[in-house]
Amino acid sequence: MVYHSSFVDEEGVTKACGCPLLPLKSHIKGPAPVSEQDKTDIVDEAITFFRANVFFTNFDIKSPADKLLIYLTFYINVALKRLEGCRTLAVGTKAIINLGLEDIPVPGETGFPFPGLFSLPQSQDEAELFRNYLKQVREETSGRLLSVAYRANGTPNKWWLAFAKRKFMNVVVL
């Protein structure tokens, strides 16, 4: 069974490219509203549901937040692929930082992993807003992913890194 986002009806949430810019429990500067620390945010959901959702090739979208959940599941898959050969937390952190420095394409640009999932930006401002939100949510996801992909002593958690070999929705990760 595919796990869906609990952010079904988010009234008053700004949208860009058909995706809600959901609040994040984040200290990283960006366009996302700040969520309360004790509440679950979309990054928590993506990490929690990743190991179950990564096995599915089809994902029935029930709310706009599911689109973001799909994107984050794919991003976690990419990040785990980068962490696959990293034997220590320090090396893994460096790999994740390098991943964060890569360009972030938005719908309509080459390299965007899910054409058709998100609507095309109606203006350059909307494209930049969405790009900045994706950058912020990716950085937040990366930080939290490192805390589960590596144990407290800095060694890899093989239970998590084993999922780097999976293809999510039959999308090949390079």
UniProtKB/Swiss-Prot annotation:
Family membership noted in the UniProt record: Belongs to the ARPC3 family.
Subunit structure: Component of the Arp2/3 complex composed of ARP2, ARP3, ARPC1/p41-ARC, ARPC2/p34-ARC, ARPC3/p21-ARC, ARPC4/p20-ARC and ARPC5/p16-ARC. Interacts with SCAR2/DIS3 (WAVE complex).
Function (record text): Functions as a component of the Arp2/3 complex which is involved in regulation of actin polymerization and together with an activating nucleation-promoting factor (NPF) mediates the formation of branched actin networks. Arp2/3 complex plays a critical role in the control of cell morphogenesis via the modulation of cell polarity development.
Signal sequence region: none
Tissue spec. comment: Expressed at low levels in all tissues with a relatively highest expression in inflorescences.
Molecular function GO labels: actin binding
Keyword list, A-Z: Actin-binding, Cell projection, Cytoplasm, Cytoskeleton
Claim: Kinase is one of the keywords in the record: no
Gene3D superfamilies: Actin-related protein 2/3 complex subunit 3
Record organism: Arabidopsis thaliana (Mouse-ear cress)
InterPro entries documented for this protein: ARPC3 (IPR007204), ARPC3_sf (IPR036753)
Main location: cytoplasm
Gene Ontology CC terms, in alphabetical order: Arp2/3 protein complex; cell projection; cytoplasm
GO terms under biological process: actin filament organization; Arp2/3 complex-mediated actin nucleation; regulation of actin filament polymerization
Protein name as it appears in the record: Actin-related protein 2/3 complex subunit 3
Pfam families: P21-Arc (PF04062)
